[in-house]
Amino acid sequence: MSAIVDIIGREILDSRGNPTVECDVLLESGAMGRASVPSGASTGSREAIELRDGDKGRYLGKGVLRAVENLNTEISEALMGLDAQEQTFVDRTLIELDGTDSKERLGANAMLAASMAVARAAADESGLSLYRYFGGSGPMSMPVPMMNVINGGAHANNTLDLQELMILPVGAASFREALRWGAEVFHMLKKLIHDQGMSTAVGDEGGFAPNVASHEAAIQLILKAITEAGYEPGTQIALGLDCASSEFYRDGKYTLAGEGGVSLSSQEFANLLATWCDKYPIISIEDGMAENDWDGWKLLTDQLGKKVQLVGDDLFVTNTRILREGIQKGVANSILIKINQIGTLTETFAAIEMAKRAGYTAVVSHRSGETEDSTIADIAVATNAMQIKTGSLSRSDRMAKYNQLLRIEEELAEVASYPGLEAFYNLR
């Protein structure tokens, strides 16, 4: 038995300089696991609740001392003596201890830190890499990275409404090659932006935030960077969008400041997205409709769902109950997986499994506020999710995940496969 003998919670800072929760779990054998949790900027209204102190005199109210206190008292007492190898039981204990649907009492940030640290301690004791501890000894696929190279919306202070414009190296032969392609396009894009007299400062997730004239101008800039880096748009490197539409959906309309302030109905916005998909090699759209616009989501899915990956982030918030409803209604064809949206590893894995059984893809994702913790890289490989979204090709908090994936691919050697377009099995 891998008995838990000590749990230590602490307040640390994330990549935006805001407090977050870190947890150490020590086992009787001397094995130790450490984990820290991320935090989002644009959040779905049904996400599990991260506990913040609200004391404006300290970190502008964003301190997490209450969550840390919960870790060091209630959570510690409840998990002490439990077998760290029994992840499902550990997570069920956390869920029952909290007693709320949204994890608002103990805080999803406190609960997730404990859940992840327990898993890391158990892997350490087993002498296994974390991805092998999660996924067993079977064959595993490396994920196709969705690389956020131009930021807008809540992630930037520019004219773009859409939150992320991404490149996807679908034609690469390996993850290592995909990462190289992405880095080369990133640096070419930086040169093009600089040559046009725009800022090359990067945002929270490492992407650029230039003041371009329109969304299509941003897309065309990326396509030029792909071409000038020596790659073929579409066949080698495809495009993806994260609209984060809930951020500009008001009173039943999608108001696009970056498109001259036009206000569009759900059908009109779906038509606009469809037009872009016809003109450009866009194969993935995240949150193409607002989280509460289920009729709009159905319109979009019926219109594009057979040829474009439609990812529900704010829509599903990594929650199996909401995902099940979406599957039943034929809404979207993919789910974004953010571990802090749901608050435990067990629930995270359940969402991935439910999606795959329904023929939906699962995209494992970071948050805009990250740490050096690279657990999501191991999760993406262990679950054969085949897609990961973990930022651009700058900022060490993003590189931590990419570099971990390089190590995993090296360790797997010839057993590692890179799926490319096969990762998009939801497209028919």
Swiss-Prot record:
Catalyzed reactions per annotation: (2R)-2-phosphoglycerate = phosphoenolpyruvate + H2O
Record CDD domains: enolase (cd03313)
Pathway: Carbohydrate degradation; glycolysis; pyruvate from D-glyceraldehyde 3-phosphate: step 4/5
Chain residues that bind (2R)-2-phosphoglycerate: Q163, K338, R367, S368, K389
EC class (word): lyase
GO biological process, one term: glycolytic process
Molecular function GO labels: magnesium ion binding; phosphopyruvate hydratase activity
Names of the cofactor(s): Mg(2+)
EC numbers on record: 4.2.1.11
Keywords: Cytoplasm, Glycolysis, Lyase, Magnesium, Metal-binding, Secreted
Gene Ontology cellular-component annotations: cell surface; extracellular region; phosphopyruvate hydratase complex
Cofactor binding, per record: Binds a second Mg(2+) ion via substrate during catalysis.
Residues at the active site: E205, K338
Subcellular location: Cytoplasm; Secreted; Cell surface
Binding site for Mg(2+): D242, E286, D313
One protein family per Pfam: Enolase_C
Family membership noted in the UniProt record: Belongs to the enolase family.
Function: Catalyzes the reversible conversion of 2-phosphoglycerate (2-PG) into phosphoenolpyruvate (PEP). It is essential for the degradation of carbohydrates via glycolysis.
Name listed for the protein in its UniProt record: Enolase
Organism: Bordetella pertussis (strain Tohama I / ATCC BAA-589 / NCTC 13251)
